[in-house]
């Protein structure tokens, strides 16, 4: 999809701040610093629109990016970061859970995992939680440019096994540097949301 118009509409901390539109929404979840902002920037064809944070756990709001007046990307607070207090973690947890389970406009979730390593326990828990609620999920293994191309098949196997995913689980290898996988991610998003050029 060709993207020309993007706007960060709201950084929400509670439900009454969510955009009051019927546009389809697509949530991006993943551990802190897994590359959510980088993926967003590649998808919307901007350099630093979605702020790439040097401080893991910094995104503590649900950030709604309106794309082409057709859909929203919703950047969800990163999970699994130790320096965020337990109270803050619980608060995020509740907000994320409410959003993912009750938001009618939500059409699917893109879960990012670091393609250089096996998924963490947090990654697995998030994936299983999404599966439990039957939320359509695309797994994106990031930073694959840091892994030799001949190891890419192994990444797919390790990630699926680590998440406890079915063999036919949608999974895309992605690199923000080379843009590998970006087109396939867009294709999945378009299928889920019914949005296209």
From Swiss-Prot:
One of its GO terms (biological process) is division septum assembly. PROSITE patterns: G_ENGB. Mg(2+) binds at residues 37, 59. GO terms for cellular component: cytosol. Keywords: Cell cycle, Cell division, GTP-binding, Magnesium, Metal-binding, Nucleotide-binding, Septation. The keyword Signal does not apply. InterPro entries: G_ENGB_dom, GTP-bd, GTP-bd_ribosome_bio_YsxC, P-loop_NTPase, Small_GTP-bd. Pfam families: MMR_HSR1 (PF01926). Gene3D superfamilies: P-loop containing nucleotide triphosphate hydrolases. GTP binds at residues 30-37, 57-61, 75-78, 142-145, 174-176. Its cofactor is Mg(2+). SUPFAM superfamilies: P-loop containing nucleoside triphosphate hydrolases. Residues 22-195 form the EngB-type G domain. One of its GO terms (molecular function) is metal ion binding. Necessary for normal cell division and for the maintenance of normal septation. HAMAP family: GTPase_EngB (MF_00321). Belongs to the TRAFAC class TrmE-Era-EngA-EngB-Septin-like GTPase superfamily. EngB GTPase family. This is Probable GTP-binding protein EngB. It comes from Limosilactobacillus fermentum (strain NBRC 3956 / LMG 18251). The gene is engB.
């Amino acid at each position: 999809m060709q993207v020309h118009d993007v706007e960060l509409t709201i950084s929400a901390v509670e439900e009454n701040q969510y955009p009051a539109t019927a546009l389809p929404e697509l949530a991006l979840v993943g551990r802190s610093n897994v590359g959510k902002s980088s993926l967003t920037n590649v998808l919307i064809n901007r350099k630093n629109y979605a702020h790439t944070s040097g401080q893991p756990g910094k995104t503590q709001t649900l950030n709604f990016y309106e794309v082409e007046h057709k859909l929203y990307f919703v950047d969800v607070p990163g999970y699994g970061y130790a320096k965020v207090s337990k109270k803050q973690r619980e608060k995020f947890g509740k907000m994320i859970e409410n959003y993912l389970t009750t938001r009618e406009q939500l059409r699917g979730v893109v879960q990012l995992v670091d393609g250089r390593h096996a998924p963490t326990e947090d990654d697995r828990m998030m994936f299983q939680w999404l599966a439990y609620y039957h939320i359509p999920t695309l797994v994106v293994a990031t930073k694959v440019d840091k892994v030799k191309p001949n190891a890419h098949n192994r990444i797919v196997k390790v990630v699926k096994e680590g998440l406890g995913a079915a063999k036919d689980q949608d999974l895309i290898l992605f690199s923000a540097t080379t843009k590998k996988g970006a087109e396939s991610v867009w294709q999945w998003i378009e299928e889920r949301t019914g949005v296209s050029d």
